[in-house]
Amino acid sequence: MEGYGEAVFATEYLCKEYRHTVALRDVSITIPRGQIYGLIGENGAGKTTLLRILCGLTLPTRGRLLLFGAADAARQSEMRRRMGCLVDGPALYADLTAWQNLKVQCLQRGLNEADIAPTLQLVGLKDTGSKPAGKFSLGMRQRLGLAVALLGKPEFLVLDEPLNGLDPMGIQELRHLLEKLNREQGMTILLSSHILSELHQLATCYGILHNGQLLEQLTAEELDARCSKYLLVRTDNDRRAVDILRKMFPEAICQATVEGLRLFPVGNEAAATASGVLMENGLHVQELAVRSEGLEAYFTALVGGDSHADAG
């Protein structure tokens, strides 16, 4: 996650507690400008809580956050004018049409009504006519919520589970739209989703939340490397094995997971080399194999198999 320059949003040791429940615990996260950041986590991991804090819908219990470099609350409130947010589901007027819903938003936020028609066309709702939002399908309501978030051409778009309710074609269209906004307008996008296969096709960097803690931040390239071939090693002394493997493969990453040690990226020849050296150092090798996996399997291994995320 190094080398991306300015962050549009960053936190340091951010915590959120609700009476006896800890929703976020010491989360230090960085959202780089110009990236599509995928926030991964099972239900209850803290994704929505983090996004609600970012959008000013709730306050952290403690910790520090920066929004476009602003640290104080007054400046952050001003900076949120540069954001578009879809969190907690779209807040819509059921008896108003799509166009009327956006007009209300324009009046409330001091935006130009001339943006309404192109925004509706952008999300595929330009032909809904006089149909009230209350009669929209779940997918159409998600699209209208996205249109609300896109009004004013925000620099930073925050979306909580935007794929909910969309059919496969709708998911593909949304993915292409977000890629276009990022590519052509330089829009920074933060989105959470449990449909990991879609995130894997869209995001340029990732954060993995589990039980309120940020386990890892990594780029798409780093994730692809870890989701390709890796060497799985289990010994009678994994702590010592880590030291030996890091000396053998100084350019590789060695990671402890519930299934054993993972070394990546590696080639097929690494298994034979590692086995011999580990045994020469007096370790009992219980398992050593070259494997490969996808994002869901990587995520499950990282959080210990206690995942409700979906491969899509």
Question: Each predicted region: which residue ranges?
Answer:
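Surface-exposed charge patches
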Residues: 104, 118, 243, 276, ...
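ABC transporter nucleotide-binding domain
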Residues: 175-265
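ABC transporter nucleotide-binding domains
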Residues: 7-9, 16-191, 196-210, 214-216
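Short, surface-exposed acidic/glycine-rich loop or hinge patches that mediate macromolecular interfaces
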Residues: 70-73, 110, 236, 268-269, ...
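Short, flexible cytosolic linker that couples an ABC transmembrane/permease module to its adjacent nucleotide-binding
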Residues: 2, 118, 219-222
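Glycine-centered loop/turn motif at secondary-structure junctions
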Residues: 110, 124, 248-249, 282
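Short phosphate-engaging motifs
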Residues: 23, 112, 198, 240-241, ...
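C-terminal coupling/interaction segments
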Residues: 2, 266-312
